[in-house]
């Protein structure tokens, strides 16, 4: 350690799924050890480009070095590019006097892992997905500590490495909400409902397919508006460019009078609240009795940490990665899993109203989700990173 002050380099980025956990751990490190010097290695094109400086951390950038997946011209160029970027990483780690490197996956992580290993710098890894990505699979060969959100990620740690399910380091707004609802969920619900323009005394279903929306989810739910509104009010976040179709389907099902927006001015105007996107998703989480959503790793972990029952509809692409994200909490009793192809208006009609009417079953889903969820992942991960920075390590 550098004269009693730990110098910690965090690596990762590209998507919010990599950047948000990184920043959560960075904040926890500073909370535990205010003297710690924390910097980040990322790319100049990922979300970290803006989010890291905005959070108050210095960002050192390298170019993306994705591993070749098939024989092509890039495969021929890869060795030279890898050598150039790892040399740049070595310079950064030397300049930053790094005591430990902690990686969160993404393009920037792989060259950092390889370089830190050659320099003898301890390595910690956080893997957020049920099936690990290529960068973290590489880093696991050399890591001293691996923190995961799921069991069975496919990572193969070296002999002697510590591996622990630590959970997902939560975004500040979500971490704050977990503490507040633990103290007084009803009060938090009332305050949040006032800001959204919804009734805190009526059940609420939150529907979201992410920032881009989910067409199949949008159509199945909006077409079932009349069935659902008999049991609950709805907040439907449609995704960009998809709100018109959703409103048309709702109108066809339940009439135009049920439609309204989101915000205090919408109170009492209708029970089907629509918007393309909601910046303060924590407000909707605070009011929700049931969430119908995709099964991204971040979404699943946040809903479990909040103890929210959910119907997960995995994105039907790749090797079914999203299904693997949702299966553990569903198997623990924290919700339902339905394939995208099966989510039809008929499925909604046959399953969701009965679930909303069964308050005991819904409450049990919530209890099981809460028991499965982990709310202090950022602190756990931060303590492991700081431990690796100690001279004895």
From Swiss-Prot:
Annotated keywords: Cell cycle, Cell division, Cell membrane, Cell shape, Cell wall biogenesis/degradation, Glycosyltransferase, Membrane, Peptidoglycan synthesis, Transferase
What does the record list as GO biological process? carbohydrate metabolic process; cell division; cell wall organization; lipid glycosylation; peptidoglycan biosynthetic process; regulation of cell shape
Reported EC number(s) for this entry are 2.4.1.227
Q: Which reaction does it catalyse?
A: di-trans,octa-cis-undecaprenyl diphospho-N-acetyl-alpha-D-muramoyl-L-alanyl-D-glutamyl-meso-2,6-diaminopimeloyl-D-alanyl-D-alanine + UDP-N-acetyl-alpha-D-glucosamine = di-trans,octa-cis-undecaprenyl diphospho-[N-acetyl-alpha-D-glucosaminyl-(1->4)]-N-acetyl-alpha-D-muramoyl-L-alanyl-D-glutamyl-meso-2,6-diaminopimeloyl-D-alanyl-D-alanine + UDP + H(+)
- InterPro entries documented for this protein: GlcNAc_MurG, Glyco_trans_28_C, GlycoTrans_28_N
Q: Which domain of life is it from?
A: Bacteria
- List cellular component terms (GO): plasma membrane
Could you confirm whether the keyword Repeat appears in this record?
no
The residues that hold UDP-N-acetyl-alpha-D-glucosamine are 15-17, 129, 171, 211, 322
Compartment annotation: Cell membrane
Q: Topologically, how does it sit relative to the membrane?
A: Peripheral membrane protein
What pathway, per the record?
A: Cell wall biogenesis; peptidoglycan biosynthesis
- What is the role of this chain? Cell wall formation. Catalyzes the transfer of a GlcNAc subunit on undecaprenyl-pyrophosphoryl-MurNAc-pentapeptide (lipid intermediate I) to form undecaprenyl-pyrophosphoryl-MurNAc-(pentapeptide)GlcNAc (lipid intermediate II).
The similarity comment for this entry is: Belongs to the glycosyltransferase 28 family. MurG subfamily.
Q: What is this protein called?
A: UDP-N-acetylglucosamine--N-acetylmuramyl-(pentapeptide) pyrophosphoryl-undecaprenol N-acetylglucosamine transferase
This chain's source organism reads: Bifidobacterium longum (strain NCC 2705)
